[in-house]
Amino acid sequence: PWQWLAAGWKDLWQTPAASISYGLLFVIMGYVMVYLVESRFHYALALTTGFLLAGPFLAMGLYDISRRLQNNEPVHLGHALFAWSRNPLPILLFGLLLGLLMIVWARLSAVLFGVLAGGRELTLDPSTAQLFFSGSGLTFLLIFTLVGALVAAAVFTISVVSIPMLLDRKTDFITAILTSITAVRANPGPMVMWAALIVIFTGIGLISAYLGLAIALPLIGHA
């Protein structure tokens, strides 16, 4: 994984304009999410974790930039934004699958928050903090984290290889998913470390008021 990051760092600074511009789109998306949820804590947490789930699909343009660099092809932001056109139908179907998983996660989140809050809306205020640090709140956080980790692991397993493969070859999305699953099963150690690094770098980007995503996500995407 560290070699992947080194390669990603190299690609990032070979095409800084296209890569960072693409990363800034994630920053804008982050601010749009903040605006939409306002102070509603449960929506904010669900959307943030959903953003992580959609990350592999959203980073498709960065994969294409690295592919073009490897093949000595010209690179600009337009190529990244329309990377899906290389293999549109399988990529669309894979995107729909990820969208379905995000909907499932959103519904699970709503149910879990409903149980914790007793049906009332959670907002960013001291009473919500007290609720989360109560006995039931800590239990909720544990369950929420475990369920979220399972969903995230499933998404990572089916997408870590599949999306780059769909861009590189004219293959169907089922074959790409099965190949991704096989790769994860064959290399559990490096894949777990890579998943952890993705969470760490994305987390740094999120807690830096989303600005860090302009560098963190292109770095991960190129790697």
Where are each of the predicted segments found?
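Hydrophobic alpha-helical membrane segments
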Residues: P1-A223
